[in-house]
């Protein structure tokens, strides 16, 4: 493969994580060889957060119904904060090459599972970030009872991106970190706005115009 020129930030990340990333991706490849029937499942999981679009659609649908409107607003806010943080700021700043571009072995593993090329940088994982944005915001709106399901979805999304060899494990890890952070930030902002709205509503009801 041709030599890849790394940005200073991408070079630091590769120096820190590549050796371990490679070993973990090798394990995923071994699992894909042993259990090829899992690959279509991983593709399906991955598609639920493709460009964040399915999750954006889910949020908008929830907003359309009074019973789920509050949840939809939280989720859409989480996705928005996460997209700005990861897709607008961090990814263009780091510009870490995809693993299948950087390493010949990983490229052969990527070819084996039939993955497609991705158009943006590898660090952090946008799919995992979106899954975490959405899930944390959903839990923020609905309480702790959904936390186990949120954790399961976030973890499965990260696994799917590694299984398909389109992200390093470190990309996924930081996608989770950024996504969880964005979800909490969005949840706090939306909760603040709701409180202010309720306060104004209470004041208005207590002092109706005569």
What residue spans do the PLM features occupy?
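Alpha-helical membrane-inserting segments
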Residues: 61, 81, 85-90, 94, ...
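Interfacial segments of alpha-helical transmembrane regions
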Residues: 57-86
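Short helix-capping/hinge motifs at transmembrane helix termini and TM-loop junctions
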Residues: 65-66, 94-95, 164-168
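Loop-to-helix transition at the N-terminal end of transmembrane alpha-helices
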Residues: 44, 74-81, 173-176
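Membrane-embedded catalytic cores of phosphoryl/pyrophosphoryl-handling enzymes
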Residues: 108-210
């Amino acid at each position: 493969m041709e030599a890849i020129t790394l940005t200073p930030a991408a070079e630091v990340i590769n120096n820190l994580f590549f050796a371990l990333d490679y070993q973990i991706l090798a394990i995923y490849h071994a699992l894909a060889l042993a259990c090829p029937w899992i690959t279509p499942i991983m593709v399906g999981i991955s598609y639920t957060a493709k460009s964040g679009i399915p999750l954006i659609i889910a949020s908008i649908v929830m907003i359309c119904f009074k019973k789920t409107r509050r949840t939809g607003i939280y989720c859409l806010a989480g996705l928005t904060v996460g997209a700005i943080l990861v897709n607008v700021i961090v990814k263009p700043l780091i510009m870490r090459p995809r693993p299948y571009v950087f390493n010949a072995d990983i490229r052969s593993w990527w070819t084996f599972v039939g993955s497609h090329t991705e158009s943006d940088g590898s660090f952090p994982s946008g799919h995992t970030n979106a899954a975490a944005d959405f899930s944390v915001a959903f839990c923020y709106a609905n309480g702790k009872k959904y936390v186990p399901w949120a954790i399961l979805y976030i973890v499965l999304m990260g696994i799917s991106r590694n299984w398909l060899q389109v992200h390093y494990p470190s990309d996924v890890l930081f996608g989770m970190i950024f996504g969880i952070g964005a979800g909490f930030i969005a949840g706090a902002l939306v909760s603040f706005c709701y409180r202010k709205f309720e306060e104004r509503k209470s004041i208005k009801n207590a002092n109706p115009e005569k």
